[in-house]
Amino acid sequence: MKYRTLAGTDLELSTIGFGVWSVSTGWWGPVDKEAGEALLNRAFDLGVTFFDTADTYGEGYGEEIMKDALSSHRQQIVIGSKFGYDLDAPREGHKERPQKWDPEFVVEACNRSLKRLGTDYIDFYQAHNARLSTIESDDLFDTLDGLVKAGKIRTYGIAVGPDIGWVEEGEFTIQKRHVPAQIIYNVFEQEPGRRFIEVATEEGVGVVSRVPHASGLLDGTYTRDTPIEFDASDHRTYRKKQWLEKGLNKLDEIQFLFESSDGTVAQ
């Protein structure tokens, strides 16, 4: 495993992180606690030290599973978590929850996350899918600075989303706030991620890439020769069929990258 410092912070991360969303919510099929904990521990054994979760994953379970699986390794890992969604508000299916950003809510969300994680600090605390008006708000960043001073978080940033795009949000985060951004970036989906990376390099700001395997299309699981069926609870079930067909077409185009080597498509 290789490690590097997240630019603009003192956080040293493994270059490959673990996204806890996939093992803590029913959005990828049924949740299996034993399998999820085994995967987290296996990742740690292989050198992964950066684990990214959120309070909204599994209604808090995405943080609780971190405590259950990795609490004995707390000093060796970097925990990223996210906030901003009102967990007390009702949710319809896969629709987005209401967001809240007032100082009292943010502080309470942090305290609840600390309890679920079983730790007294969060390394990388991210505003979850914050919109431009929120990122422009000094109140939010004053609150986050207060959490840093209180020792409850080490540093903070913005998780840009929820889906691909959000150019203004990403650029404002990097250029004006000068804090790390978590973005969507993979071989299939390179824009606007490529632009964000260029700007971040110019500004000396870190970027964390998520969805590196294009929601499973780049992990070697799916090909034209294998039946592709998603569980009814899997969020990919609700995507347009064109998404899968387009992804398989792109997968055909990059076969040359690994056919003549010992590497896999995931690598």
Question: What spans do the regions from the language model cover?
Answer:
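Conserved, mostly hydrophobic/aromatic
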Residues: 6, 18, 36, 51, ...
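Beta/alpha (TIM)-barrel catalytic core signal, keyed to glycine-rich beta->alpha loops juxtaposed to Asp/Glu
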Residues: 130-267
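Short, acidic/polar
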Residues: 30-43, 101-117, 163-171
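N-terminal binding-site loop/beta-alpha segment at the start of enzyme catalytic domains
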Residues: 1-78, 89
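Active-site groove signature of glycoside hydrolases
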Residues: 114-133
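Structural motif corresponding to the early beta-alpha repeats
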Residues: 76-100
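Active-site mouth loops of central-metabolism enzymes
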Residues: 22-34, 92-104, 129, 133
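Short, well-ordered coil/turn segments that N-cap beta-strands
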Residues: 11-16, 47-50, 73-77, 119-123, ...
